[in-house]
């Protein structure tokens, strides 16, 4: 998880807890600043307590990248020993080795909707507020099996 009190962090955490609980598992949450170095250090300091065949479900791709770096630094294999799933899918998921499985946000669709809303507000002097929900998509790559 992230050490932020923001709506998106709470939403991601709730989704994780609900899903893990639904399949009969107990959720484990560790909160970090959104820095890969914090996640890497966590792995390096928790080395003796890590249970193989665990999948790290990370609040961001940046944290997932740090988990990956930490696991590689202690000599374990991803995805053979541990799985990693990130969240965002905007760049970092593609630069890691192995490439990260991620929950990809609909960034293009968000931008298009934002532009359309802005044009509508300008053309029609529209001051109303609206919310739109965009669902992420699971993109399976090399960090899970």
Feature roles, as predicted:
Residues 27-28, 40-145:
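Flexible loop/turn connectors
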Residues 13, 36-43:
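Short, well-ordered alpha-helical scaffold segments within catalytic/effector domains
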Residues 2-3, 28-37:
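Short beta->alpha junction loops
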Residues 19, 33, 99-100:
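Short, exposed beta-strand "edge-strand" segments with a Pro/Gly-rich flavor and a Y/T-containing core
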Residues 5-9, 35-36, 64:
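Alpha-helix N-cap/loop-to-helix initiation residues
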Residues 1-23, 130-144:
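An alpha-beta-alpha
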């Amino acid at each position: 998880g992230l050490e932020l009190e923001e709506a998106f962090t709470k939403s991601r955490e709730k989704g994780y807890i609900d899903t893990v609980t639904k399949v009969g598992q107990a959720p484990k949450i560790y909160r970090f600043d959104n820095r890969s170095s914090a996640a890497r250090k966590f792995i390096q300091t928790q080395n003796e307590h890590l249970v193989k065949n665990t999948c790290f479900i990370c609040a961001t791709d940046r944290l997932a990248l740090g988990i990956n770096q930490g696991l590689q630094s202690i000599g374990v294999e991803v995805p053979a020993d541990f799985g990693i799933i990130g969240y965002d899918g905007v760049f970092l998921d593609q630069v890691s080795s192995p490439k990260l499985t991620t929950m990809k946000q609909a960034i293009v669709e968000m931008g298009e909707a934002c532009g359309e809303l802005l044009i509508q507000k300008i053309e029609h002097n529209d001051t109303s507020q609206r919310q739109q929900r965009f669902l992420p998509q699971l993109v399976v790559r090399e960090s899970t099996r």
